[in-house]
UniProtKB/Swiss-Prot annotation:
The lineage of its organism: Eukaryota, Metazoa, Ecdysozoa, Arthropoda, Hexapoda. GO terms for molecular function: UFM1 conjugating enzyme activity. E2-like enzyme which forms an intermediate with UFM1 via a thioester linkage. This is Ubiquitin-fold modifier-conjugating enzyme 1. It comes from Drosophila mojavensis (Fruit fly). SUPFAM superfamilies: UBC-like. It comes from the Eukaryota. Pfam families: UFC1 (PF08694). GO terms for cellular component: cytoplasm. The active site is at C116. Keywords: Ubl conjugation pathway. One of its GO terms (biological process) is protein K69-linked ufmylation. Signal peptide: none annotated.
Length: 165
């Protein structure tokens, strides 16, 4: 189910140990530390391989995440806002990643711009609780979604390049 490139990417993202969500206040801080360490490592790996494609930050509690992601297509950079909340049942329940500006532009999206991850990602997440975290959701959820959907939306003329200069 996972190709060699994805397997290599995954092997370079640290697996998490602590099984805690936002409801477990004391342990959540420790889980959040693991999340940040995994995200930092994933971003460093992406930069080293020339495939840097997102920036994330969170509120103080680590329950709301937001930032930017981008996809390069025909040497043009398409940039999108990305956001998600950490579910109260996390890490059992994966975060629902949203790209609000693409809401309603593709069938592979739910209301509010939440990307569809049901068929491929969620079963993989369920098998890897609590080892998977936010970095894994980005690598296995958002990255492949962008790779499939953005070129299709561009070719259909649904999204167009915006020059940010």
């Amino acid at each position: 189910m996972v190709d060699d490139s994805t397997r290599k990417t995954l092997s370079n993202i640290p697996l998490l140990q602590i099984r805690a969500g936002p409801r477990e206040k004391d342990v959540w801080v420790q889980r959040l530390k693991e999340e940040y360490q995994a995200l930092i490592k994933y971003v460093e790996n992406n930069k080293q391989s020339g495939s840097d494609w997102f920036r994330l930050e969170s509120n103080k509690e680590g329950t709301k995440w937001f930032g930017k992601c981008w996809y390069m297509h025909n040497l043009l950079k398409y940039e999108f806002d990305v956001e998600f909340d950490i579910p109260v049942t996390y890490p059992t329940t994966a975060p629902e990643i949203a790209l609000p500006e693409l809401d309603g532009k593709t069938a592979k999206m739910y209301r509010g711009g939440k990307i569809c991850l049901t068929d491929h990602f969620k079963p993989l997440w369920a098998r890897n609780v609590p080892k998977f975290g936010i970095a894994h959701a980005m690598a296995l959820g958002l990255a492949p979604w962008l790779a499939v959907e953005v070129p299709d939306l561009i070719e259909k003329g649904i999204i167009t390049y915006k020059d940010n200069c």
